């Protein structure tokens, strides 16, 4: 068995399968997607999995929470001895720097969580005894993933820690603080963690910077920016939570965020408005083209059908109309729903 294992939001398997198929074809690697709706993962079967993984960077994949290279598929595992067949399948492999035992984030996968936890504790010492796992986590070495699809069915896969999600299941465990104005704050928190590298965050999100938040009410995204000590112009006809205004970093303008433009360029423009995705893509492109912002993070609400087609169309429309040299990344975040979050920054 050779291929890529990618986790996704339950119900978005067709979109991830279409994305992997399109991207593999673009780089000239043949393969096919194996999945069923609501599995919470897609297995892209191909002979050149390592080469494909190197060409498809994790941050560039839209619908994939995690990207792994499959090295074995084990079926019919004896529940009384799962360790022996795993050690046999790993014979000849290099030493791994860490072990994550996982399951898909799906209705069928979640009942396997307790098995994953307990089996990980049993497997670690066996791997170390066999010389297959370092004594302590070594992030510079490949990471071993065991993904249980059922009690007797598992996929063994490898991750490059520099090109994969740094969280089990590809899900960042963010806590909604009591003072957050809305749950949407988690979207921007996750976007900053996922779409930007640590070095990019340090360089591009600094105290004293200026931002515009379009469609800001009740202030979730504005609040996230103020916690980074960024000055925010929050544009919305609706009210902001009082404690957001009390930071002293926020100017609230009662206006239509879709048509407002700043008097001076800002470092960041963020937008989480409920609007047709193509209209949003066009308006965001105008902001970039006119030089009203240097960088932007915005959400595109996807239709119920043809979501991959709409995603491609909107991103192509944005890049064509922006008329700038940009680095564009998009993700369906864990805290997103029927939407994707897009980052565009000056190249």
UniProtKB/Swiss-Prot annotation:
The keyword Transcription regulation does not apply. Pfam families: FtsJ, RlmM_FDX, RLMM_N. S-adenosyl-L-methionine binds at residues 184, 217-220, 236, 256, 272. One of its GO terms (cellular component) is cytoplasm. It is found in: Cytoplasm. Its main location: cytoplasm. This is Ribosomal RNA large subunit methyltransferase M. The lineage of its organism: Bacteria, Pseudomonadati, Pseudomonadota, Gammaproteobacteria, Lysobacterales. The gene is rlmM.
């Amino acid at each position: 068995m050779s291929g890529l294992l990618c986790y996704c939001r339950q119900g978005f398997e067709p979109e991830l399968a279409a994305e992997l198929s399109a991207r593999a074809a673009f780089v000239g690697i043949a393969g096919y997607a194996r999945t069923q709706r609501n599995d919470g993962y897609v297995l892209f079967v191909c002979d050149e999995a390592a080469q494909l993984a190197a060409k498809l960077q994790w941050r560039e994949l839209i619908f994939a929470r995690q990207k792994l290279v499959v090295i074995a598929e084990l079926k019919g595992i004896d529940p009384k001895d799962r360790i022996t067949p795993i050690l046999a399948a790993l014979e000849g492999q290099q030493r791994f720097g860490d072990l994550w035992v996982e399951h898909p984030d799906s209705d069928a996968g979640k009942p396997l969580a307790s098995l994953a936890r307990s089996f990980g504790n049993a497997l670690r010492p066996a791997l170390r005894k066999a010389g297959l796992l370092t004594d302590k986590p070594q992030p510079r070495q490949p990471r071993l993933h065991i993904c249980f699809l059922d009690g007797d069915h598992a996929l063994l896969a490898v991750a490059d820690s520099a090109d994969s999600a740094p969280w089990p299941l590809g899900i960042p465990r963010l806590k909604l603080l009591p003072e957050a104005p809305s749950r949407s704050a988690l979207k921007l928190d996750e976007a900053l963690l996922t779409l930007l590298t640590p070095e990019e965050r340090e360089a591009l999100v600094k105290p004293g910077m200026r931002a515009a938040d379009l469609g800001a009410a009740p202030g979730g995204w504005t609040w996230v920016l103020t916690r980074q000590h960024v000055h925010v112009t929050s544009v919305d006809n609706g009210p902001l939570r009082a404690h957001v205004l009390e930071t002293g970093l926020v100017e609230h303008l009662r206006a239509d965020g879709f048509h407002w433009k700043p008097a001076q360029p800002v470092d960041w423009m963020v937008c989480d408005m409920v609007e047709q995705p193509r209209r949003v893509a066009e308006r965001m492109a105008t902001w970039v083209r006119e030089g009203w912002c240097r960088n932007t993070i915005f959400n595109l609400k996807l239709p119920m059908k043809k979501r991959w087609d709409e995603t491609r169309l909107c991103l192509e429309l944005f890049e064509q109309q922006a008329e700038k040299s940009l680095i564009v990344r998009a993700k369906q975040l864990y805290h997103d729903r029927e939407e994707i979050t897009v980052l565009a920054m000056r190249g």
